[in-house]
Amino acid sequence: SSDLPNEIKDAGIPIFNVDTAVIEDDIENFVTQFVGTNAYMAGQLVGEQMAKDYPDGADIAILDFPSNESCVDRVNGFLDGLGDNKDKFNIVAQQDGEAALDASMSLAEDIITANTDLQAFFCINDPSALGAAAAVKAANKTGQIGVYSIDASPDGKQALLDGEFTAVACQVPVQIAEYAFNAAQKYVGGDTTIDEKKVYLDSHLVLKDEAKQTVNDWQ
């Protein structure tokens, strides 16, 4: 029922919110602690890598997912990560790939067709990037059009190893689960001090060596 959060709160039961944050009011009123990946940082790392890969700038496309706050943070981080070279990057398209492979593939095909000088895609997650990579492959442009992603899922790592992804920054769901579990255990055990209401764990770029060693796992 809609009153369930109040019932949980009244019963003195802690709520640990992981990965995707509930709305701000609910965090304030009901959540003991939120634990997620630093989405802005993940985007920033990818933007910095793209700026290194294209020092003279490039025509790029962004497949976003504006209805999800974390994905908006990733795009903002990415744009800031381009840094001083940001003005050299021409965003020829920014469209909602719905964080999904099929929708992103269809959009990417149209973007590639309409923009013969396109040099790279930034996608907000691996399913979206896998769709873009499939469109790039269908156009025989693997290696010519870069695909930059965030997640580093097993499928994303394989795509990196296969040369279909150029770079990928990681989500850290395993670390999130471990952190939240330990925090909850501590809380239930009687230590109810919460240093930070919201905890954002660091992202990093997953390079091929790490991808090879952890290809079947999340981090």
Predicted regions and their residues:
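Flexible loop/hinge segments that line or gate small-molecule binding clefts
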Residues: L4-M41, K52, D59, S153-L161, ...
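Structural recognition of the beta-strand scaffold that forms the well-ordered cores
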Residues: P14-D19, F34-G36, D59-D64, A93, ...
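Short beta-strand elements in bilobed, periplasmic/extracellular small-molecule ligand-binding domains
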Residues: D59-D64, L79-L101
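Short, solvent-exposed amphipathic alpha-helices that sit
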Residues: A42-V46, S70-F89, A103, L107, ...
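Structured segments of extracytoplasmic/periplasmic soluble domains
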Residues: E7, A11-P14, V18-A21, Q49-G57, ...
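Hydrophobic alpha-helical segments within soluble ligand-binding/sensing domains
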Residues: F34-D59, A103-M105, A152-G156, V172-G189
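Hinge/cleft segment of the Venus flytrap/periplasmic-binding protein
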Residues: L82-G83, V172-Q219
